[in-house]
Amino acid sequence: MRALLFALTLIACTATAAQDVSGVHDFDFLVGDWKVHHRRLKTRLAGSTERIEFDGTQSTRLALGGAGNVSDNWFDVPGGAYRGVSVRAFDTKTRSWAIWWLAGRDAHRALDPPLQGRFESAGTFYADDTFNGRPIRVRLIWSQITPTSAHWEQAFSPDGGTTWETNWISDFRRRKAQ
């Protein structure tokens, strides 16, 4: 009987541990409505340090039975506001996330290549892409995550990841329910 209880306890602990480390809930913090302050380089991969600052909103909802989510983004950029959509999906086999971006200003263009990665101390995601006809590496980092705030950074690397230029920084503040 003691052996049976020990085995059942071990199975329960193993199942709980597997659920806790799976990663499927890593983006749950993002579900809801956010005010976002953005700081983006005016010119990317050109040695520029001049940033454009603007505000926006993001509304995120779960999808794929909780193994994904969709974010509707609004950017109040000087020169004309626009929208974009982020789609995130979790792969249970690799325990990693894929993130796709669709810009509303160019909605008929193909989706950007998915960024892939996972959360450890922060969420870090990479993709190979092109910028102005040149191959680049893209990196996104989610950090400083609390129930009411989060920090996001995008960086490009023109040299395969040896050096990085952080070109977009966003600070998220959860909107109060109305």
Give, region by region, the residue ranges found by the protein language model.
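Hydrophobic small-molecule pocket/channel-lining residues, especially in calycin-type beta-barrels
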Residues: 17-178
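Bacterial N-terminal signal peptides
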Residues: 5-13
